[in-house]
Amino acid sequence: RRENRTSESIFGYCTYEGGYFDVKYMTKEYLRQAADQGSEPTRNSFVKSRVLFSSDPEIEELVARIPVFQEKERDEKMLSFYSDLYMSYDYFWKACRPEGYMKIRTASEIVYCIYRLILQENRVLFPCNRRLEETVAGLENKPEGIVELCRQFCEEQTDELAEKIMSLYASWTTYDWTKDPGQFYTQYCRDFEQWWLYPRPLLAEW
């Protein structure tokens, strides 16, 4: 840590062309914290992990606890992601009529929230943004055609497509999205304006 080299890529030893070893050095305390309160990308990074050697009998148990969907966080995450979706669509997209950067940002946030909500309803860990869309596409339980529609929306960014996406998700989900809008606004403020008050990962990586 003193040299800021706890992560590195090692080339030249992998058994397939273009391959490399993605190395991250972790302490036992890191593993314990990841098992107790790790973010979903952290937990997902341990999927299919194996302990090849350890003189510490606790390591294997700690590693096994990490790549597990956290049911206790599900309700709060559903509220947070739906609140973000609600504000992104109803306020930023429909009321603010964004252009340029903000239009791209809002469109991607709408898609991001829908994808994260679908993962939560399936109790599937969020891997990372790079793998998010392919993970959702691989699920059987999802709104029919949602990935194709979201990709089209990201490219064209029209009101008609935004409305179609929202309607498709609303007709599929089992989440109670008919709550008082004030609850969604309150949660949005907590997640985006007051996040520094609470010991929790930012919504984008939670």
Language-model features and meaning:
Residues 67-206:
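Conserved nucleotidyltransferase catalytic core and NTase-mimicking acidic/glycine-rich helix/loop elements
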